[in-house]
Amino acid sequence: MNNIFEQMLSRYPIISDKDRQNAIYEVMQQITLAGLYRGGFFNKAAFYGGTCLRIFHKLDRFSEDMDFSLLTTDSSFKLENYFPSIIDEFKMLGREIVITKKDKRNFNKVESAFLKDDTEVYDVAFQTEKSLKIKIEVDTQPPLKFQTEQKLLLHPFSFMTRCFTLPDLYAGKMHALVFRTWNNRVKGRDWYDFEWYVKNGINLDFTHLQERIREFNGIEVDKEEFLRLLKKRLASTDIKMVKQDVEPFIKN
């Protein structure tokens, strides 16, 4: 059974140490999704963000963090209830892990601006290699008015994962692109993902985008104003910084 982990790794072309690290992260993410599925997590929550786009829609860059949203607000929700399922899933594949809660006071300005007080953040790390870890975030009081769909994942076994639809994934990315700012910098991965959505002709769910802006930023924005903000953000983007940010996560 524990060769399944290595079999999952073998699906990735690994030339450099960075290639191997990225592959390990993604295998860990898939195993974590499997554990959450077995625990019934997706009856209450949905997967979104860059890692969701990578795993289920073949975005050609690796992604580090796992972002989840409850389907409805629930301040009593505890991700800890699903830890046994995640730990057991790794154990079945011959890997011991530890799950630790992160102290949000240590996050930088960009991270903390996009983490509300009711967002829980945890690290999943190997028992023997704690530097190899993935971050899990669950928003228990999320912006709503989004749609979800069931997506099939084949590894480590075949199971369904509840995910945001592409228009709502796009809305989350556009919110990050325009409002996640730090000294006028745009996170390179946001730019890279934005280009993917445009190239693939994905429609934007503006209703959900407006809901995210209300929830995180406390303002009302119509389409005309949002386009103005987007153009301003793109005009101030440092392309060299964008490339530096995204290069470790892509092959070319």
Which residue stretches match the model-derived regions?
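Short glycine-biased active-site loop of nucleotidyltransferases that positions the nucleotide triphosphate
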Residues: R54-S63
